[in-house]
Each structure stands twice: as structure tokens, then as C-alpha cells.
UniProtKB/Swiss-Prot annotation:
Organism: Dictyostelium discoideum
Function: Converts N-acetylglucosamine (GlcNAc), a major component of complex carbohydrates, into GlcNAc 6-phosphate. Also has ManNAc kinase activity.
EC number of this enzyme: 2.7.1.59
Entry keyword annotation includes Nucleotide-binding: yes
Name the UniProt record assigns to this protein: N-acetyl-D-glucosamine kinase
Catalyses which reaction(s): N-acetyl-D-glucosamine + ATP = N-acetyl-D-glucosamine 6-phosphate + ADP + H(+)
Lineage: Eukaryota, Amoebozoa, Evosea, Eumycetozoa, Dictyostelia
Family as reported in the entry's similarity comment: Belongs to the eukaryotic-type N-acetylglucosamine kinase family.
Domain of life per record: Eukaryota
Quaternary structure annotation from Swiss-Prot or TrEMBL: Homodimer.
Length: 319
């Protein structure tokens, strides 16, 4: 009798994590391969990264089977959570890679990374709301009927208010307003210049517009300064985080209303992303506003990584 496994894949912008679990959800094997976002690395490298992970975990599971006469492994289901895969043609492309390797009959699902993040907090159940606040931000959810809703995720140029990028941008904005004497002084000025190893505010122009380092991440990497200085009593830093909490609440509120979750006796709300999954001023501000308006929300942090969240979705799809 062959051993049945369930595979979850988290295809992020920097790496691809693949996990195999058994029918009880116990982890059997894990592998990390390069980026599988084909918009970033191209189709060939993305396909190779996904195939590498699948082949590795199957091989490792086979190595653990003690029955020398039967080392067969059957993939009961596979679930992929992929960044940059939202359109139908993207999903069909990735599906073709998987079915080429595992066969057309494979039980298969593909979701964007927000859905897998929700599963990481709900142990594989697609019910409730997730708010992701990293470099960008998005809220997504499902009601009991399986209807989905989302808000945000438009990217820094079109929105992402409340995101790490926006917090970093607001730090720069307030530092320069203080320099121009059109806004109050802030302790962010000194710590920002120290972090970037600059001597004066005018140097921020070349830092911000340097074509060699143009990325949303470099703005988001400034966001910890607001957390640190708010903790030390800086009013501007606290204001930035209050604005961020209000923006994140608006995303969550929109999804709750769209899905009618306000009428539920209780629903899970999963926090994930570096800016809110750790306890701190932003998560406290957000939680306070949530509980004032939705006392039926059960605020959760993720209990496993996204690849395990995907594996649990794969497992639950067979139940």
C-alpha cells in the first residue's frame, strides 16, 4: 500500500518553500528552493523551483519508508500559495507545470499568498479574515458559504495605506516637514539620518531617488523607526502608527461588511506580516479598534508558516 502525502507550496518573491504532510497533518519533509514568481525570474526558473521542491519532498518521504517492498508515495493533493498569480492565465500556466510532473488527475489548487496566510492562522480552514501588513498590505476573507472578499493589495503607487512602505514614506514626509518648519519637530530626524548614514536632510533626495536602489522595500525598511520612537514618546511617530492602524482597520472593516461576518457569533481574524504579527503599538491600536466595533472577532496570529498553511489546505481538500 502506497503512502499518501499532501504537499503545500509557498511561492514568495525571494524563495519557494515546499512541505509534505501525512494524513494527520504531521510534517514529513521540507525544502527551500529559489524564487518561483515567474514575473520576476521567468517561466523556466519558476517552473524549475517548483519542480525541485516537489521532487525533493517526495524523495525524502520515500527514504523514510521502512518497507523495502513498497516505497511508493502517492500525492493525495497539492496546494500552492503564489505571489503574483491572480489572473486565470497565470493559474493555468502554473497548473501546467504541476500536472506535467504529477499527472493530469492530481487534486490541485492554487491561491494567492493572502489565502494561504489565512490558512496559516486557521489551521487549514477557509473561514474568517486575514490582514497582511508587510511591505504592502491586503485584507481577504471567506464567509461560511465560501464567498470571498478582499480589500487593498493595490501596491504602493495605488494605495497600500497602513503598509510598511507607507509608514516609511510617512517618516520621510514628516522629517522633511520639520526641516521646512511646516510641521513639528520629531526625534525621527536624528534616528533616520543615523540609520541611513547621512549628515543632513538634503541628503535624503539622493537616497530616495537613487536609480540603483529603487525599491519599495527600502522605504518599508524605515518603518521600525516609527515603532521605536513612538515607544519613546515621539508624538509624530505615534501619529504615523495611529494613521496606519486606521487604514488597516478600514481594509478589515470592508471585508467583514462584504462577507456579512458582522452577523456571525464569532469569526477568526488573522494578523500576519512583520508590522502587526508581533505585539506592539500598531497591533495594539488595531486590536483596540477592532474589538470596539467587532467584539465577535477572534484575533489570531499565524500558528505555522505559509507552506504548512498550504499543506493543510491540501489535506482539508480531501476530507
Amino acid at each position: 500500500m502506497s503512502k499518501e502525502i499532501f504537499i503545500g507550496i509557498d511561492g514568495g518573491g525571494t524563495k519557494t518553500s515546499t512541505v509534505a504532510v501525512d494524513s494527520n497533518g504531521q510534517e514529513l519533509a521540507r525544502h527551500t528552493s529559489p524564487c518561483s514568481n515567474y514575473h520576476s525570474v521567468g517561466e523556466d526558473l519558476a517552473k524549475a523551483a517548483i519542480n525541485e521542491g516537489i521532487k525533493y519532498v517526495i524523495r525524502k518521504v520515500k527514504e523514510t519508508i521502512t518497507d523495502d517492498d513498497n516505497k511508493e508515495v502517492t500525492v493525495g493533493s497539492i496546494c500552492l500559495g503564489m505571489s503574483g498569480v491572480d489572473r486565470e492565465k497565470d493559474k493555468l500556466l502554473v497548473k501546467s507545470w504541476v500536472t506535467e510532473l504529477l499527472g493530469e488527475s492530481i487534486n490541485y489548487s492554487i491561491h494567492n499568498d493572502a489565502i494561504v496566510a489565512l490558512s496559516s492562522g486557521t489551521q487549514g480552514k477557509l473561514f474568517g479574515v486575514v490582514i497582511i501588513c508587510g511591505t504592502g498590505c491586503i485584507s481577504l476573507g471567506f464567509n461560511r458559504e465560501g464567498v470571498s472578499g478582499r480589500s487593498g493589495g493595490w501596491g504602493p503607487l495605488l494605495g497600500d495605506y497602513g503598509s510598511g512602505y507607507q509608514i516609511g514614506y510617512d517618516i520621510l514626509r514628516h522629517v522633511l516637514k520639520a526641516k521646512d518648519q511646516v510641521g513639528p519637530k520629531t526625534s525621527l530626524t536624528q534616528v533616520l539620518l543615523e540609520k541611513l548614514q547621512l549628515t543632513k536632510e538634503e541628503d535624503l533626495i539622493s537616497w530616495a531617488y537613487d536609480p540603483k536602489t529603487q525599491s519599495w522595500q527600502k522605504f518599508a525598511q524605515l518603518s521600525p523607526l516609527a515603532f521605536e520612537q513612538a515607544q519613546l514618546g515621539d508624538e509624530i511617530s505615534n501619529l504615523i502608527l495611529v494613521d496606519a492602524a486606521n487604514a488597516l482597520y478600514d481594509l478589515i472593516n470592508s471585508v467583514i461588511k462584504k462577507l456579512g461576518l458582522d452577523k456571525e457569533e464569532k469569526f477568526p481574524l488573522v494578523y500576519t506580516g512583520g508590522n502587526i504579527e508581533r505585539k506592539g503599538i500598531l497591533s495594539d491600536l488595531l486590536s483596540k479598534k477592532i474589538m470596539e466595533n467587532y467584539p465577535n472577532a477572534e484575533i489570531l496570529n499565524t500558528t505555522c508558516d505559509p507552506s504548512m498553511g498550504a499543506a493543510l489546505l491540501a489535506l482539508n481538500s480531501k476530507k
